[in-house]
Amino acid sequence: MSTAAPILLTPGPLTTSARTRQAMLVDWGSWDRDFNQLTASLCQQLLAIINGAGTHHCVPLQGSGTFAVEAAIGTLVPRDGKVLVLINGAYGQRLAKICKVLGRAYSTFETAEDEPTTAADVDRLLQADASITHVALIHCETSTGILNPLPDIARVVANHGKRLIIDAMSSFGALPIDASEVPFDALIAASGKCLEGVPGMGFVFANQASLAAAEGNSHSLAMDLHDQHSYMAKTGQWRFTPPTHVVAALHEALLQYNEEGGLPARHQRYASNCKTLLDGMAAIGLRSFLPADIQAPIIVTFHAPRDARYAFKDFYERVKAKGFILYPGKLTQVETFRVGCIGCVGPDGMSAAVNAIAEVLREMEVLDI
């Protein structure tokens, strides 16, 4: 087995740089001025990525990305609102479950796991149901890696006078989203994805006017984004104990993000990773689940080999022993596994991963791929 730390080819947590990990070796006082300045700098840098200064607030929140998604829906959707949830995978299903648990009225529109939702679909659905106030969708559905057509859907939602909530967990920082061109009430992301920080903090880019009007909407004290933002604006501090080391790591990760060249460079590296992965896997006979035109360069789903000697658990452990951690499939009808293209890794690392996978399949005597 490799004695080095494995490379995480997953959708998050990810392999991080030594500099990012080093940033967590310093302790911070949660109410100290230096930490408050760190938080403010972080939010300013995050807003700059979406060109959101002046129109949106960046509201950070402790916890996983799902915490932030739930906070956004609970804060920005009034209790008498109704959400149209667009689904083509497990994370869209989670959006619907959040609405159900929060007691928000909702309807769903579901397409196949390899079929993007179209703007025409959304236009038809909004024409048919005037009671819908908000539309929620996953930008890059992590269960497959499918990319939904966000700009087109956003225009349709805005034309109908409705509000858009975007789960951009697996796309923010790597795929372009400009708040001046894509109208939305909320865009949600997290520290441990394409920014290559560590998990433990989500953040919501909330439309300033919508957030100001959201007082009293939230079902929760801890997840009330209106209260979180108001308190931060007055004091510079988090309401409750912040994940200080996570914030410091993300701040350092953003320095490296900008040194690399920002979003264009991060996108280019991930796209190169994805191409290297797809070409290499095709050469050994492994088929990707999605066609190239709807495949985001974030995570790729592959059909599992048909050979009876293939078993994912054994395959996973053998690849791990060679230094790479993969991800199980999350489809309902087809046996698959997933390989991430993101994190502190480049095309050479992806080539090494493909070689490790090929070696393992030979060791397992898997022939029918």
UniProtKB/Swiss-Prot annotation:
Bilayer-crossing residues are: none
- The EC designation for this entry is 2.6.1.37
Q: Which domain of life is it from?
A: Bacteria
One of the GO biological process terms: organic phosphonate catabolic process
Q: Molecular function terms in GO for this entry?
A: 2-aminoethylphosphonate-pyruvate transaminase activity
Top enzyme class: transferase
Cofactor(s) listed: pyridoxal 5'-phosphate
Its keywords, alphabetically, are: Aminotransferase, Pyridoxal phosphate, Pyruvate, Transferase
- UniProt catalytic activity: (2-aminoethyl)phosphonate + pyruvate = phosphonoacetaldehyde + L-alanine
Q: Which residues carry this modification: N6-(pyridoxal phosphate)lysine?
A: K193
The answer to keyword Transferase applying to this record is yes
Similarity field: Belongs to the class-V pyridoxal-phosphate-dependent aminotransferase family. PhnW subfamily.
Quaternary data: Homodimer.
Q: Which PANTHER family does the record cross-reference, listed alphabetically?
A: 2-AMINOETHYLPHOSPHONATE--PYRUVATE TRANSAMINASE
What is its biological role?
Involved in phosphonate degradation.
| Protein known as | 2-aminoethylphosphonate--pyruvate transaminase
Organism expressing this protein natively:
Pseudomonas putida
The lineage is:
Bacteria, Pseudomonadati, Pseudomonadota, Gammaproteobacteria, Pseudomonadales
The gene from which this protein is expressed is phnW
